Amino acid sequence: MVSKTFFLAAALNVVGTLAQAPTAVLNGNEVISGVLEGKVDTFKGIPFADPPVGDLRFKHPQPFTGSYQGLKANDFSSACMQLDPGNAISLLDKVVGLGKIIPDNLRGPLYDMAQGSVSMNEDCLYLNVFRPAGTKPDAKLPVMVWIYGGAFVFGSSASYPGNGYVKESVEMGQPVVFVSINYRTGPYGFLGGDAITAEGNTNAGLHDQRKGLEWVSDNIANFGGDPDKVMIFGESAGAMSVAHQLVAYGGDNTYNGKQLFHSAILQSGGPLPYFDSTSVGPESAYSRFAQYAGCDASAGDNETLACLRSKSSDVLHSAQNSYDLKDLFGLLPQFLGFGPRPDGNIIPDAAYELYRSGRYAKVPYITGNQEDEGTILAPVAINATTTPHVKKWLKYICSEASDASLDRVLSLYPGSWSEGAPFRTGILNALTPQFKRIAAIFTDLLFQSPRRVMLNATKDVNRWTYLATQLHNLVPFLGTFHGSDLLFQYYVDLGPSSAYRRYFISFANHHDPNVGTNLKQWDMYTDSGKEMLQIHMIGNSMRTDDFRIEGISNFESDVTLFG
């Protein structure tokens, strides 16, 4: 007679087998393990480059030279050194009462997303892989590579778990592998000025992203992914990063003779006409950073950089948070000071010119925005309550623009509440007399004009565009604000969650957002039809991309407004 003990032992053995940690083999024989989370195998905190510390601080990433053997990829790595995104949330709480106006089911996820990058370390070049449970190395699943945003001064891959995308892809019968990459931000990743340019280490953050993509090309097949079917996508500065990866090296996205990526999605971001790495903005940001770190920016290029590399992480973190422009919650001026810059290397020319001259990777893409992108940024100018105040504020952030250019902007964006953002709300939601006007300017300057520049310049590839309006008339003052799409993609399952995920998963699989989604047909953008998908809280519809033509066209043509 078989004992009860035997059956219990057998049952425990089966359970143990089912819950066994997933593994992957790298470099031929180095075994790493991850964690089974429900129906998703997760591998978190995998190094893809050597730690950018000591003499490697501010430099381009170097290939990982360690061993993966025995790595327990159970937890996200620390975020790269950065500003605290909680400062932005705190300001919005103070100015617009964020905690009161955001619906209950979105408030918690918003704060969770902001807190994803609290733990920081300069040793931060790690990535994460999410795949359907039990995926075999020969599965050849499409790969979705996520690049986070954060104004190029904060952000972390830990804020964006890929479980939801993987689960949805399995339910659709179109399984994918999801990868998220850390990259350096602020002065660590986008230090500008003469010194770093002469050293040849500009745009280190873009090189981090590229090094991550090279790792994917070399290794993702070991996790069941297909290196010949990689889609890159990102939001805000992540989308701007995607835009710059498309024009990197004049559109050459190859590595070892193969494309690093084969399609792209840009959410709330596109190419910006940044001035080059030795222009006034990045040079002054470099000088301020050195000054607050206790280094003499006038001592000579090599001496100043050596001084900065000798400082502790705490000293440099304090310096980054001590700028005299920090009264604008450390976002806008530093965003204009730190970011991808033409350097004659990875970015050989201004991004607008690279697109307009056809020097971009010829891959299909999706680009779109939230309707009221600028409302979450407008509080930086909360004290601008009259037209003269607004012009003075514009001159402050658009220092290269002439008075005539600024007057033109003000005439195209009048102070009428009914024409500002949140759009289509009449006289409502005017936090201050100029709030809606400033929010509209931000929306079109930073988001809508780069989107249209891209669409107009890339006539030889298939492209789709969208406008998201899911929070229209639901969130006072903010409307469908910048970043609200992330809540539905990564943190809640309601309303437009399935639209974002299913369209994007289909695009990763087929380079067409319409296959097997059970959603509204999304027509491809054409120059004649200007077809645009509109994403609502419930359902989607097609419309024409024909709003605010004159104002947005002015931003497209006058690059001095970005200086």
Swiss-Prot record:
Its EC number is 3.1.1.3. SUPFAM superfamilies: alpha/beta-Hydrolases. Residues 1-19 form the signal peptide. InterPro entries: AB_hydrolase_fold, CarbesteraseB, Carboxylesterase_B_AS, Carboxylesterase_B_CS, Type-B_Carboxylest/Lipase. It comes from the Eukaryota. The active site is at S236 (acyl-ester intermediate), E373 (charge relay system), H482 (charge relay system). Glycans are attached at N302, N383. Gene3D superfamilies: alpha/beta hydrolase. GO terms for molecular function: triacylglycerol lipase activity. Keywords: Disulfide bond, Glycoprotein, Hydrolase, Lipid degradation, Lipid metabolism, Pyrrolidone carboxylic acid, Secreted, Signal. Disulfide bonds join C80-C124, C295-C307. It catalyses: a triacylglycerol + H2O = a diacylglycerol + a fatty acid + H(+). GO terms for cellular component: extracellular region. The modification Pyrrolidone carboxylic acid is found at Q20. It is found in: Secreted. Its main location: secreted. It is an enzyme of class 3 (hydrolase). Pfam families: COesterase. One of its GO terms (biological process) is lipid catabolic process. Belongs to the type-B carboxylesterase/lipase family. Monomer. Hydrolyzes all ester bonds in triglyceride and displays a high affinity for triolein. For unsaturated substrates having long fatty acyl chains (C18:2 cis-9, cis-12 and C18:3 cis-9, cis-12, cis-15) GCL I shows higher specific activity than GCL II, whereas GCL II shows higher specific activity against saturated substrates having short fatty acid chains (C8, C10, C12 and C14). This is Lipase 1. It comes from Geotrichum candidum. The gene is LIP1.
